[in-house]
Design a protein with these regions (language model features):
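Metal-dependent polysaccharide deacetylase catalytic core of the NodB/CE4 family, i.e.
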Residues: 1-68, 127-134
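Anion (oxyanion) recognition and catalysis
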Residues: 3, 46, 71, 122, ...
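C-terminal domain-boundary segment and adjacent tail
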Residues: 4, 77, 127, 132-175
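Glycan-processing catalytic domains of CAZymes
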Residues: 9-12, 54, 77, 94-96, ...
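Acidic, His- and aromatic-enriched active-site or binding-groove loops in soluble protein domains
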Residues: 10, 71-86
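Alpha-helical scaffold elements lining the catalytic groove of polysaccharide deacetylases
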Residues: 17-46, 85-124, 142
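Short catalytic/ligand-binding loop motif for oxyanion handling, primarily in non-cytosolic enzymes
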Residues: 17-20, 62-66, 86-87, 137-140, ...
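Short, electropositive alpha-helical surface patch
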Residues: 63-78, 147
């Protein structure tokens, strides 16, 4: 399986269609409703053999209710717009998501800014996290920006990694 090969399974929403037009699915949910959605998603993933303890909300934004509900449902890592939080130790590794599409801009000036920001972060030894909507990769500008981000991060010593939770190294193993 892909998981045994090192890939991470990350829960990225459950019923986004109900809220997509307004905001990210978990951006404004109270704890009770977030709890219901997380329980439902967890059961579905368990049924198909993809149960995970890692969570990244659509739009990278989570409500306080969602943050409260995640550990109650066994989740151990939250990846949001500004960092990765170990929900067991409550420690956060700060690292901003740099993205194109799906809530992020796609204009040429944004692509240039994204590349410069990623290079600055990598040069300073930070964690470079990228997100791109697949449909944006059909366009040459966003595609080249993402390739440049990866090349520059590697050039400055960043190592590719997946989101992973480990009690010995909270959250910082993801990049």
């Amino acid at each position: 399986s892909r998981r045994s090969g090192g890939d991470a399974v990350v829960l990225h929403g459950y019923d986004e269609a109900a809220t997509k037009r307004l905001r990210g699915e978990f951006a404004a949910l109270p704890a009770h409703e977030a709890n219901l959605r997380l329980m439902g998603a967890d059961r579905v993933l368990e049924h198909v053999g993809l149960r995970t303890r890692l969570f990244a909300a659509p739009g990278w934004t989570v409500s306080a209710g969602t943050v409260t509900s995640l550990p109650r449902n066994g989740f151990r890592l939250l990846a949001d717009l500004h960092g990765m939080t170990d929900l067991v130790s409550r420690s956060t590794v700060r690292s901003r998501v740099l993205g194109i599409g799906e809530g992020f801009l796609t204009e040429p000036w944004w692509c240039r800014t994204l590349v410069l920001s990623a290079e600055r972060t990598a040069r300073r030894g930070g964690i470079v996290r990228v997100a791109v909507a697949a449909r944006q990769l059909r366009k040459s500008g966003p595609r080249q920006a993402m390739l440049d981000v990866v090349d520059l991060a590697l050039m400055h010593g960043c190592a590719p990694a997946v989101y992973r939770w480990g009690s010995d190294r909270p959250a910082s193993s993801a990049a």
